[in-house]
Amino acid sequence: MAKDDVIVVDGKVIEALPNAMFRVELDNGHVVLCHISGKMRMHYIKILPNDTVKVEITPYSLDKGRITHRYK
């Protein structure tokens, strides 16, 4: 899968789940299950509920995503 295949959207974290998983509500109202990208894990970037984040979603599974950026 090439990097061009991802859909990038913004969303708001509504719930923190075990194993660094998060439930994120996207700007269009959909709720997806997301995990943190490897670079964010390496740099110990903490994500809390009500944070605004950038999410990458593949067209193959629209209900799962990857958090790649946390806005300040």
UniProtKB/Swiss-Prot annotation:
Ranges for domain S1-like: 1-72
Subunit structure: Component of the 30S ribosomal translation pre-initiation complex which assembles on the 30S ribosome in the order IF-2 and IF-3, IF-1 and N-formylmethionyl-tRNA(fMet); mRNA recruitment can occur at any time during PIC assembly.
Keywords noted in UniProt: Cytoplasm, Initiation factor, Protein biosynthesis, RNA-binding, rRNA-binding
Lineage: superkingdom: Bacteria
Family: Belongs to the IF-1 family.
Listed Pfam families: eIF-1a
Range of residues in the leader sequence: none
Name of the protein: Translation initiation factor IF-1
Coiled coil: none
Localization of this protein: Cytoplasm
Keyword Protein biosynthesis tagged: yes
Xref: InterPro entries: NA-bd_OB-fold (IPR012340), RNA-binding_domain_S1_IF1 (IPR006196), S1_domain (IPR003029), TIF_IF1 (IPR004368)
Gene3D superfamilies to which the protein is assigned, alphabetical: Nucleic acid-binding proteins
Function: One of the essential components for the initiation of protein synthesis. Stabilizes the binding of IF-2 and IF-3 on the 30S subunit to which N-formylmethionyl-tRNA(fMet) subsequently binds. Helps modulate mRNA selection, yielding the 30S pre-initiation complex (PIC). Upon addition of the 50S ribosomal subunit IF-1, IF-2 and IF-3 are released leaving the mature 70S translation initiation complex.
Gene Ontology CC terms, in alphabetical order: cytosol
Gene Ontology molecular function terms on file: ribosome binding; rRNA binding; translation initiation factor activity
